[in-house]
C-alpha cells in the first residue's frame, strides 16, 4: 500500500481534520436528512445538446458572443458569497504573473490556501475506492455554500427557476463554491450529490460537465477533474471550474494526430510539453466526444492508472493527462527540490497554472522550474504508449500514428523542431473569444 502525507485543500468551511469529533447535533444547514426538508435552490436547466441534435461546425463570423446567462449566474452568486465572507481568503489579492519564456506558465502566490491544516495521509495506489460516509463529503457542506442546481433540460431551451425545492428522490447536481479558490469564480460541480458517488468518471457525469462548459459559452471557463491518486482531495464525485482570462500553456502546445474514431473524434498527442497527454476533439456531437473520453477514463480507472482531465474551449476540447507524481512521491523518487515547493501537480498545475505556497518559489519562478516540476508527474514514453494502447483498445481504435501530411498542428506560428526539447515551440493565444477563432454551436 502506497501512501503520502500532504495538506488537503479545504473546499468547505465544514471540512474538519480527520479524527475531529462531530459536535452534538448537526449545527449547520447541510444537505443531510436532518436539514434537507424544505431546502430550496435556484435551478438552471441548460439546453440538452443530445436531444437538440446540435453538432460541432465551424463558423467564420467574427462576432463577439454576449455574456451568457450561466456566466452571469455563476459570477453573481459567487460574488454574493464573497461579500458574505464565506471564503477563507481574498483570492483577488493573490499575486499572479506570467512566467517569462516560450510557454507562458502562469504563477500565483497563494499563501492562504493551505494554512491551518495538518498534513493528512492519503492512499495513492488505488484509483477506485468506495465512498465513505464517515469522512467529509459534499452532503456535509452548508447550504449557504451552494449556488444553484444544474441539469441538462428536456429540450433545446434554457430554463431558470429562481427557487426550486431540492428533491431527495431525484438527486440534483449542484454547483458550490470552493472556499479555497484559485481564481475568481472558482466553483465545484457535484453530479447527483445525494447519490454519494465516489470520485470516479462515468458517462453521465462527464457529459454533464461538458454541458456546463458549453453552456458557459466562454473559452476562459474551464472544468477540471482529478482522480484519486492524481490529487483529488475528496472521494465524492466532483469537478472544479473557474475563469482564467488567458490560454493555459497546455492548450497552446502543438499536437500530433494519432487516430480518429468511427464517430469522428480526433485523438492527438501533445508534443513538447512536460506532461505526456492526449487531446480529444471533434466528433459528430458533444456526446460522442464526451463518451469517447469517458470510455478511456473508465479503462484507466479499471487499470488503476491515475489521471487528470481538462475540459476546454467551451467543451470542444478535452485533455486527458495520465500521471504518476503521487506514486513517485510515495516511493521516494521525486527530487527533494521539487518536494520542497509543496506543489501538488493536479489538473490546474499540469495545465500550466502553478499555485505556489512560498514567496521564494514565486519570486524565483522560471520556465525551467515549472517544466522540472511538471515533468515529475509525466509517465515515461514507454509507459505512456502502454496506457494509450489500453485506452484505444477500450474505444476500438488503433494507436498507430497516422502518417499524413500536416498531422503536427501548431497552435500558433512557430519555427524549429517541435520534437526537440532544445527547440521547444508551442502556440500563441488559441482564442480571443470570437466565433471566428473557435468552434461554435449552430
From Swiss-Prot:
Record carries keyword Nucleotide-binding: yes
Catalytic activity, EC: 2.7.7.69
Keyword Magnesium: no
Disulfide bond sites: none
Entry's pH dependence statement: Optimum pH is 7.5.
InterPro entries: GDPGP
Effect on the protein of changing residue 224 to D: In vtc2-2; loss of activity; dwarf
Inducing stimuli: By jasmonate, ozone and high light. Circadian-regulation, with a peak in expression at the beginning of the light cycle.
Stated family: Belongs to the GDPGP1 family.
Name by which UniProt lists this protein: GDP-L-galactose phosphorylase 1
Gene designation: VTC2
Amino acid at each position: 500500500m502506497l501512501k503520502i502525507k500532504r495538506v488537503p485543500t479545504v473546499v468547505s468551511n465544514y471540512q474538519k481534520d480527520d479524527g475531529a469529533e462531530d459536535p452534538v447535533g448537526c449545527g449547520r444547514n447541510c444537505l443531510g436528512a436532518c436539514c434537507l426538508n424544505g431546502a430550496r435552490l435556484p435551478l438552471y436547466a441548460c439546453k440538452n445538446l443530445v436531444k437538440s441534435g446540435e453538432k460541432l461546425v465551424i463558423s467564420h463570423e467574427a462576432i463577439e458572443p454576449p455574456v451568457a446567462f450561466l456566466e452571469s449566474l455563476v459570477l453573481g452568486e459567487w460574488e454574493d458569497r464573497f461579500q458574505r465572507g464565506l471564503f477563507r481568503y481574498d483570492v483577488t489579492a493573490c499575486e499572479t504573473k506570467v512566467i517569462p519564456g516560450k510557454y507562458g506558465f502562469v504563477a500565483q502566490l497563494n499563501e492562504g490556501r493551505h494554512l491551518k491544516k495538518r498534513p493528512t495521509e492519503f492512499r495513492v495506489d488505488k484509483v477506485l475506492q468506495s465512498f465513505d460516509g464517515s469522512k467529509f463529503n459534499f452532503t456535509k457542506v452548508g447550504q449557504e455554500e451552494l449556488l444553484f442546481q444544474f441539469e441538462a433540460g428536456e429540450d433545446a431551451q434554457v430554463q431558470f427557476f429562481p427557487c426550486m425545492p431540492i428533491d431527495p428522490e431525484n438527486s440534483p447536481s449542484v454547483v458550490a463554491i470552493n472556499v479555497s479558490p484559485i481564481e475568481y469564480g472558482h466553483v465545484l460541480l457535484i453530479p447527483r450529490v445525494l447519490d454519494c458517488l465516489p470520485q470516479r468518471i462515468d458517462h453521465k457525469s462527464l457529459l454533464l460537465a461538458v454541458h456546463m462548459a458549453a453552456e458557459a459559452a466562454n473559452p476562459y471557463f474551464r472544468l477540471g477533474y482529478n482522480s484519486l491518486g492524481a490529487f483529488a482531495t475528496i472521494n465524492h464525485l466532483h469537478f472544479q471550474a473557474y475563469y482564467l482570462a488567458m490560454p493555459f500553456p497546455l492548450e497552446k502546445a502543438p499536437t500530433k494526430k494519432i487516430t480518429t474514431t468511427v464517430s469522428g473524434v480526433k485523438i492527438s498527442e501533445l508534443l513538447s510539453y512536460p506532461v505526456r497527454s492526449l487531446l480529444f476533439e471533434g466528433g459528430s456531437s458533444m456526446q460522442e466526444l464526451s463518451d469517447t473520453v469517458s470510455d478511456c477514463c473508465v479503462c484507466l480507472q479499471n487499470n488503476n492508472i491515475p489521471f487528470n482531465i481538462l475540459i476546454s474551449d467551451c467543451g470542444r476540447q478535452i485533455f486527458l493527462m495520465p500521471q504518476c507524481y503521487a506514486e513517485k512521491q510515495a516511493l521516494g523518487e521525486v527530487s527533494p527540490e521539487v518536494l520542497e515547493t509543496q506543489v501538488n501537480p493536479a489538473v490546474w498545475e499540469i495545465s500550466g497554472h502553478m499555485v505556489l505556497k512560498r514567496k521564494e518559489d514565486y519570486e524565483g519562478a522560471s520556465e525551467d522550474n515549472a517544466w522540472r516540476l511538471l515533468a515529475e508527474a509525466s509517465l515515461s514514453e514507454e509507459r505512456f504508449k502502454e496506457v494509450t494502447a489500453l485506452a484505444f483498445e477500450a474505444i476500438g481504435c488503433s494507436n498507430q500514428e497516422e502518417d499524413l501530411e500536416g498531422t503536427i498542428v501548431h497552435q500558433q506560428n512557430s519555427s524549429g523542431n517541435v520534437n526537440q526539447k532544445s527547440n521547444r515551440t508551442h502556440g500563441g493565444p488559441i482564442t480571443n473569444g470570437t466565433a471566428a477563432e473557435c468552434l461554435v454551436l449552430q
